[in-house]
Swiss-Prot record:
The record marks 19 as: Transition state stabilizer. It comes from the Bacteria. GO terms for molecular function: 3-dehydroquinate dehydratase activity. Substrate binds at residues 73, 79, 86, 100-101, 110. Homododecamer. Keywords: Amino-acid biosynthesis, Aromatic amino acid biosynthesis, Lyase. The active site is at 24 (proton acceptor), 99 (proton donor). The lineage of its organism: Bacteria, Pseudomonadati, Pseudomonadota, Gammaproteobacteria, Alteromonadales. It catalyses: 3-dehydroquinate = 3-dehydroshikimate + H2O. Catalyzes a trans-dehydration via an enolate intermediate. The keyword Cell membrane does not apply. This is 3-dehydroquinate dehydratase. Pfam families: DHquinase_II.
């Protein structure tokens, strides 16, 4: 496999399937990641995954990766984490931002993202399918001639 994509999931996403299923859906994060790994394998792309409720662990994973692309759902860190934004900018790896819910249709404090202005694209409101869209876009971008 010639390409690698890092999938980063932020706080509370380990509770998918149990936490507010009317907002976030019934699939678990393990189910979503398994489907994405299969999608990546079919495209001959390696998908590395990290989920953490600890900001520093996400930052360390971003610093350590040798991936050519990142897909990130920063979750609640979307609205608060300059440090996570700086980690992404520091490694200069292109990234897509994903959110399960439509953050713009929710509480006002969720409307601001520290990542959107630097992301290749933002996908929100499509539930777990948003990850599939982001992965397809990342794979397509990686396979484009330089």
């Amino acid at each position: 496999m010639s390409h690698k994509i890092l999938l980063v999931n932020g706080p509370n996403l380990n509770l998918l399937g149990r936490r507010e299923p009317s907002v976030y859906g019934h699939q678990t994060l393990a189910d979503i990641v398994a489907e994405l790994k299969q999608q990546a394998k079919l495209a001959e792309v390696e998908l590395e995954h990290i989920q953490s409720n600890a900001e520093f662990e996400l930052i360390n994973a971003i610093h350590a990766t040798d991936a050519q692309m990142i897909i990130i759902n920063p979750a609640a860190f979307t609205h608060t984490s300059v440090a996570l934004r700086d980690a992404l900018l520091g490694v200069a790896i292109p990234f897509f931002e994903v959110h399960l819910s439509n953050v713009h249709a929710r509480e006002a404090f969720r409307h601001h993202s520290y990542f959107s202005d630097k992301a290749i694209g933002v996908i929100c409101g499509f539930g777990s399918q948003g990850y599939e869209f982001a992965l397809a876009a990342a794979i397509k971008r990686l396979n484009q001639p330089q």
